[in-house]
Amino acid sequence: MQEIIASVDHIKFDLEIAVEQQLGAQPLPFPGMDKSGAAVCEFFLKAACGKGGMCPFRHISGEKTVVCKHWLRGLCKKGDQCEFLHEYDMTKMPECYFYSKFGECSNKECPFLHIDPESKIKDCPWYDRGFCKHGPLCRHRHTRRVICVNYLVGFCPEGPSCKFMHPRFELPMGTTEQPPLPQQTQPPAKQSNNPPLQRSSSLIQLTSQNSSPNQQRTPQVIGVMQSQNSSAGNRGPRPLEQVTCYKCGEKGHYANRCTKGHLAFLSGQ
């Protein structure tokens, strides 16, 4: 009734103008001070604040949805530049690690969110379409719903507000459900013709040479076998005739088996 008889909406007091223009606001003595209890800077929202880090009001950029866990302990050094919220809001706290990992939290006064794991499970798109091959072992939620008869016929007057289910007939294509490309189905032998032909011809020659019992092996095969035997022989320990003791300088034994002592090399000079 007072607003109808004596409205003051057209009157603007000097105090309101001073608050909007931040008149009398003194800059901070040094940057990095805690401004969690201060108001939001109106000029920063309009990109017109020239005080920078010395501004006594908060500079909020974007929508911050999670509370800063370092700010809760008084250890956040970013100040207004922090990408998390510097405000104690229980609805915007981070998720509790122990409750999400083990399903329980022993802290009765835990400040973090305890989110029900069932709420994180999404609906199965295959089951909503009509059939899911994974059955009860599916990692997604299988919710039984009653299909709208009007929607199956072709039109439902209720639209999105219908209490029955409007099924989706498009197939959900995942990374594992996609059919292979035609290039991947081709065998690798068709891509390069020359190397397999040369390899097959060499195998035919070797089998034809080894098929006759009276025919001797070719020098190439013998050379390959000798090189294999020599490489196999080099893998073993060397004979003692080729071993030289670095203590006494004589051959025939290792340095750890030398009986002349560590000053034996002086006797040879």
Curated annotation (Swiss-Prot):
InterPro entries: CPSF4/Yth1, Znf-CCCH_3, Znf_CCCH, Znf_CCCH_sf, Znf_CCHC, Znf_CCHC_sf. One of its GO terms (biological process) is mRNA processing. One of its GO terms (molecular function) is sequence-specific double-stranded DNA binding. Keywords: Host-virus interaction, Metal-binding, mRNA processing, Nucleus, Phosphoprotein, Repeat, RNA-binding, Zinc, Zinc-finger. Component of the cleavage and polyadenylation specificity factor (CPSF) complex, composed of CPSF1, CPSF2, CPSF3, CPSF4 and FIP1L1. Interacts with FIP1L1. Belongs to the CPSF4/YTH1 family. Component of the cleavage and polyadenylation specificity factor (CPSF) complex that play a key role in pre-mRNA 3'-end formation, recognizing the AAUAAA signal sequence and interacting with poly(A) polymerase and other factors to bring about cleavage and poly(A) addition. CPSF4 binds RNA polymers with a preference for poly(U). This is Cleavage and polyadenylation specificity factor subunit 4. It comes from Homo sapiens (Human). The gene is CPSF4.
